[in-house]
Amino acid sequence: MDKNIIIGAMTALITPFKNGKVDEQSYARLIKRQIENGIDAVVPVGTTGESATLTHEEHRTCIEIAVETCKGTKVKVLAGAGSNATHEAVGLAKFAKEHGADGILSVVPYYNKPTQQGLYEHYKAIAQSVDIPVLLYNVPGRTGCEISTDTIIKLFRDCENIYGVKEASGNIDKCVDLLAHEPRMMLISGEDAINYPILSNGGKGVISVTSNLLPDMISALTHFALDENYKEAKKINDELYNINKILFCESNPIPIKTAMYLAGLIESLEFRLPLCSPSKENFAKIEEVMKKYKIKGF
C-alpha cells in the first residue's frame, strides 16, 4: 500500500444541527463548498464534528453523506473512527471502510489512560481490521494520554496501513524529532496556529478547523508549502493569524460554528450539551474579526 495517500489540505468538518438533529442538507452543502475550494480531503465526525455527542447512527450517517458527496471528485474522505474501547474503534473503522471512506482518523483513547503497550495493541488491532489507510491522532490536551514518538514509529513500521500521525500536541520539537527518526512518516498538522511551522519542517498536510470557513486560503497555504514556496505560504499564514486565534477563543468547535453561522453558511447555531453557545463577549469578538475577512455575510 502507498502510505503517502491522504495528505494535503484537509478540513475537520463541523456537524450542523437543526432542531436538535443533524442537518443533512446543510452538511452536504458544506462538503460541496470544500470540494469547490481546493480541499484535498474532508474529515467527518472528528473533534470538530462533535463526534462525542453523536449517536452511532448519526456518526454513520455523516460518513455516508461525506462519501456520497465526494463521489466522482478528487476529494478523499478520511473518516473519524476513534474510541477509547478498541472493539468499538474497530467497528467504526470497518463501517467506514465498508461504506467507501478512503481512510480513517483514529484518536488516542481518552479517559482510561492506557500504557504505551496498550496504545500499540489498540492501534495494531484497528490497522489489522481494515485495509485502508489509518492516520493516528495525538491530542493529549483532550485525551489525557499522549502516544510517544517511539510508539508512533513502531506502529508505522509494523503496520502497513498506518501511514502517519495528526499531531495536535502543540509540541513542534516532538514533530521535528519524529521526522528525524522516521522521515517516511506522514506528519499532519492538527492545529491551525502551527500549520506553517509543521509544513515548513517536513509536514505533509493539515487537518484544519479554519478551512471550514476559509478553505481556499488553507488550501493555498498548504500547497505553497508542499511546493516549497515558503514565502507565499508564510504570507497566507500571517493573513490567517487573527482568524486562527479567535476560532479557538473557546473550546472547538464553538467558535468555528459561530463564525459559520455569522457567515450564513449554516442555518442554526446549535450545539449539544455540554457544549453551548459562546459568551456574549466572545460572540462579539468573533463577529468583529469576521468583518476583516472577505467571507459571505460580511
UniProtKB/Swiss-Prot annotation:
Which reaction(s) are listed as its catalytic activity? L-aspartate 4-semialdehyde + pyruvate = (2S,4S)-4-hydroxy-2,3,4,5-tetrahydrodipicolinate + H2O + H(+)
Q: At the top level of its lineage, which domain of life is listed?
A: Bacteria
The main place the protein resides is: cytoplasm
Which GO annotations describe the biological process of this protein? diaminopimelate biosynthetic process; lysine biosynthetic process via diaminopimelate
SUPFAM superfamilies (alphabetical)? Aldolase
Q: What is its EC number?
A: 4.3.3.7
Q: Which Gene3D superfamilies does the UniProt entry name for this protein?
A: Aldolase class I
Protein name as annotated: 4-hydroxy-tetrahydrodipicolinate synthase
Supply the source organism for this entry.
Campylobacter jejuni subsp. jejuni serotype O:23/36 (strain 81-176)
Which gene underlies this protein?
dapA
